[in-house]
Swiss-Prot record:
Gene3D superfamilies: Band 7 domain. Signal peptide: none annotated. GO terms for biological process: establishment of protein localization to plasma membrane; phagocytosis, recognition; phagosome maturation; regulation of DNA-templated transcription; response to bacterium. Keywords: Coiled coil. Belongs to the vacuolin family. This is Vacuolin-C. It holds the Pfam family Band_7. Residues 472-526 form a coiled coil. One of its GO terms (cellular component) is membrane. InterPro entries: Band_7 (IPR001107), Band_7/SPFH_dom_sf (IPR036013).
Length: 586
């Protein structure tokens, strides 16, 4: 049979981009440490959104481009037809190792007959149209599932294909169907020199691009690097092996330092040995330092701090110096009063660092607490040596004064004023100094003081009781007076309310009488108008009045007056009334 062409119904316009295999490494970039858009490394399908029928036509068109004499025919000779294929299948064959694709659409088909004995046409069977991958003699169809990438090699270079169908005409194309498909949501996709990293929210990633360290913050779009020396620093033994918590206050990666000073603290760094203080950033972003000679030292608290002296370090040193030291000698700082008595004290000091630059420059990180402890004990020892035990015990019961009058200042006030001046020179503000504990080390004197304390406590308790009783009686009297005032106020309010109610009632009655009078006046005016218009009504009304007047009277008629009575209008009143009513009706 003579070779026939593919019917025109299967022919579409040629597409220029037939060979889709390409490698990002063909492009050059000046700075390989910068992330590039994902679209620059992922080859997208330009007909992924077409209908299935249209996709089939495009696949056949591109797969068979350049073939002048098709190897298939839809008009097979008798006995040469292949078994029918379902409409969801392609037919695959090759002519002299040149692959060809055909869509039989469920109809009869076969390969063409060639009279040339050197031409070999082979039928390679049916291929499902939904097949993810099939290839023959350098021609490949790749269907990347939704939400996936396909990793392949072309010309020994890595390529990544996006979701949808692809037709690749490339004899060097290599793809492993078992491992080539990868989910797009994978946190890290590595394909030879192509690296795609997705940093989730709340995380950061440490990576190396050659010898250049990078700390990648979280963002919606993935980071894409094309570099054979790209490497992600993994965490051993962690579920998130690729990522670190972004809330970490300090993170170091190579020469990069990522610092987040919190409110109430500052970061201490040394740039080429020069102290630099980093404050809490106001923009809410971490501070990034990218210098191999700019080192992070520590965080220093600038908010209020409270320390108890002697400190633990001082106590340990006391034990080390004297293993036979008593608990008082270890836990208390011992001084001698003006009257040669030994007392032990514990100090509470509250302070804040207002100028970390000066404090660290003059004292260093470890020397701040030691300096405060030493000079506070020095000033307190000087004040105790100038005071008697009685003065110390008296002033210990009094809180530090708020005044600066020297005559009224306590020992604590004097020590605080001197200590505050000393610390201010070192960038430290003293907020409070208090003698937390004071103990007389002489046993006999301590007992006497304890007895005095008991007596004083009893007196204080009795005094407090009397004051309390006075307060109770005063409160009761005040409550009674307030109750009486409230009762009087309520009574006055009730009287006023009653008077107002009566006034309102009288007003309502007066208004009612006025309305009634107005109504009667209106009726009389209407009657007057009627009587003026119809005089007979006035006569009738007058007759009614006379009739009513005569109802209760008795009329005596004598025989001699009978004639006059018959001529009286009263005799004819009823007849007149009847006649008048008849005239009105007519």
């Amino acid at each position: 049979m003579i070779e026939s062409k593919i019917p025109s119904q299967f022919s579409i316009n040629s597409h220029n981009n037939v060979c889709e295999a390409s490698s990002y490494s063909d492009h050059s970039f000046d700075d390989n440490t910068q992330s590039i858009p994902l679209s620059q490394v992922v080859i997208r399908s330009d007909f992924a959104n077409e209908t299935s029928e249209r996709q089939s036509k495009i696949i056949i068109e591109r797969f068979n481009q350049g073939i002048k004499n098709p190897a298939f025919t839809d008009s097979p000779a008798l006995g040469r037809a292949f078994p029918r294929l379902d409409s969801s299948y392609f037919a695959l064959s090759n002519r002299d190792k040149v692959a060809e694709l055909f869509d039989p659409r469920g109809q009869r088909f076969s390969t063409v007959y060639s009279a040339d004995p050197t031409t070999i046409i082979e039928y390679n069977g049916g291929i499902p149209k939904t097949s993810r991958y099939f290839t023959l003699y350098g021609k490949t169809v790749l269907n990347v599932p939704s939400g996936h990438f396909a990793k392949a090699l072309s010309k020994n270079r890595p390529v990544i294909y996006g979701e949808g169908p692809h037709v690749i005409i490339d004899p060097t194309f290599i793809f492993d169907e078992a491992t080539g498909f990868v989910n797009q949501q994978e946190p890290f996709i590595n394909h030879s020199t192509i690296n795609v990293l997705r940093v989730p929210s709340g995380k950061v990633a440490k990576v190396w691009v050659g010898t250049q360290p990078l700390i990648l913050e979280s963002r919606r779009e993935p980071y894409v690097f094309v570099d054979a020396q790209f490497k992600v620093v993994e965490q051993i033994g962690s579920q998130d092996k690729y990522f670190h918590n972004s809330s970490a206050t300090f993170m170091e990666h190579g020469s990069i330092k990522r610092i987040i000073p919190h409110t109430g603290e500052v970061a201490v760094t040394y740039n080429n040995g020069v102290l630099e203080i980093i404050q809490t950033p106001k923009d809410g972003k971490p501070v990034i330092i990218d210098s191999p000679t700019h080192n992070f030292e520590c965080f220093i608290q600038t908010s209020l701090q409270t320390c108890l002296f002697p400190s633990n370090e001082t106590k340990q040193q006391a034990i080390k110096d004297n293993k036979n030291a008593t608990s008082d000698e270890v836990n208390l700082k011992i001084f001698q009063t003006r009257d040669s008595l030994r007392v032990g004290v514990v100090l509470v000091i509250a302070f804040r660092i207002i100028d970390p630059q000066i404090a660290l420059t003059k004292l260093g990180k470890e020397g701040i607490i030691n300096h405060i402890e030493n000079i506070s004990f020095a000033d307190m020892g000087k004040a105790i040596q100038l005071s008697t035990l009685q003065e110390i015990m008296y002033f210990n019961d009094t809180k530090p004064s708020a005044t600066i009058d020297a005559s009224a200042q306590t020992i604590q006030d004097r020590v605080k004023s001197h200590l505050a001046r000393d610390l201010y020179e070192y960038g430290i503000e003293l907020a409070r100094l208090q003698i937390e504990t004071i103990k007389v080390l002489d046993t006999e004197i301590a007992k006497k003081l304890a007895g005095q304390s008991v007596t004083s406590a009893e007196f204080t308790t009795k005094q407090a009781t009397l004051v309390k009783e006075y307060d109770i009686k005063t409160t009761e009297a005040r409550l009674k007076a307030e109750t009486d005032n409230i009762a009087l106020e309520q009574k006055g309010i009730a009287i006023i309310a009653e008077a107002q109610a009566k006034l309102e009632s009288a007003k309502k009655q007066a208004e009612a009488l006025l309305v009634t009078a107005n109504a009667q006046k209106k009726v009389q005016e209407i009657q007057g108008e009627l009587y003026s218009k119809f005089p007979i009504l006035a006569e009738i009304e007058l007759a009614k009045i006379k009739s009513e007047a005569l109802k209760s009277s008795t009329l005596y008629i004598t025989p001699q007056d009978a004639g006059n009575f018959m001529n009286s209008p009263f005799f004819f009143m009823e007849r007149m009334l009847g006649k008048q009513q008849t005239n009105i009706k007519s």
